[in-house]
A protein has these predicted regions:
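N-terminal secretory signal peptides that target proteins for export/translocation
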Residues: 1-6
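Alpha-helical interaction segments
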Residues: 7-8, 240
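Phosphate-group recognition and catalysis centered on beta-loop-alpha active-site segments
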Residues: 20-285
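Bacterial N-terminal signal peptides
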Residues: 8-20
Length: 285
């Protein structure tokens, strides 16, 4: 009799368990360039703000100086819209500057005009990856770090293989093998890292609708697919999950986008305003 009752109610029990698991699952928050909406992007103040806000992951971009130092910057050149350089600066290209020359630039002197809430913090310098990794003891957050590679401009970055070697050296130095995700639109650095250190998690960044999520991860060796938020549908997310992939869209800053991504059951969200996203997710539970 007991067995009959168990079999009779098994479908309902499975459904209830699935609902409970879905309710308990947490969508992780990645602070895009730290917290670009409110602080100078890719800066120590932005990362410190994001840590205080309670992010799960610090997201950032990397460039390489003339003397082969990894620094945190989205662009291969210094952007005069919010970075002020010395009067005698000979170049704006990071790869053509030594670290000492790069540190003369002030990237907090002017707020980014694209983000009205962003606070200017004069004296903010471009941090090295070493300096950002030194924040690791401040919490249990991970790092999602992007190799900025420009195939049409090979002179502004090292080779993909050299880039991966430099990144791995910093990961090893800080013993962060379990806390770092390497992401890129250029899969050459992902494949290079897979060959050097298969234990490092890899994320395939996707920007175009014609890119197949699952095939892109097969091609790059990634277990994380990171599409533009506009490419996300529940069906694509479900297919990625069925293939064993984690889905981490970028860059979502509006409540309407967050609602859509939650409904699509993504695993994490990359946002310029991580504090607002965290508050939204807490309120919507």
């Amino acid at each position: 009799m007991l067995m009959v009752m168990i079999l009779r109610f098994a479908p309902a029990l499975v459904c209830l368990c699935w609902i409970a698991m879905a309710a308990d699952s947490k969508i992780l928050v990645h602070g895009h360039r730290g917290a670009r909406a409110v602080m100078p992007e890719n800066s120590l103040p932005a990362f410190e703000y994001a840590i205080q806000a309670g992010v799960d992951v610090l997201e950032l971009d990397m460039a390489v100086t003339k003397d082969d130092v990894l620094v945190v910057s989205h662009d291969p050149e210094m952007n005069p819209a919010y970075c002020a350089g010395p009067a005698n600066a000979k170049t704006k290209v990071i790869r053509e500057m030594t670290l000492a020359e790069l540190k003369q630039w002030d990237c907090g002197a002017k707020a980014n005009p694209g983000f009205p809430k962003q606070k200017a913090i004069p004296g903010t310098r471009v941090p090295t990856l070493d300096e950002v990794f030194a924040l690791a003891p401040r919490g249990k957050f991970d790092f999602n770090i992007e190799t900025k590679i420009f195939p049409q401009r090979p002179s502004v970055t090292p080779t993909p293989e050299r880039f991966a070697e430099l990144v791995l050296a910093q990961i090893r130095k800080h013993k962060l093998e379990r806390r770092v995700i390497l992401q890129s639109f250029d899969f050459r650095t992902l494949r290079a890292m897979r060959n050097l250190a298969p234990e490092i998690r890899l994320s395939a960044l996707l920007a175009f609708p014609q890119q197949d999520w699952i095939q892109s991860c097969k091609d790059s060796g990634a277990t994380i697919v990171s599409p533009n938020v506009k490419l996300v549908t529940p069906e694509k997310v479900a297919a990625a999950h069925a293939a064993g992939l984690t889905v981490v869209p970028w860059t979502a800053n509006e409540a309407t986008e967050w609602k859509m991504l939650v409904a699509a059951q993504v695993d994490a969200i990359i946002s310029d305003d991580p504090a607002a996203l965290i508050a939204y997710l807490q309120h919507s539970r």
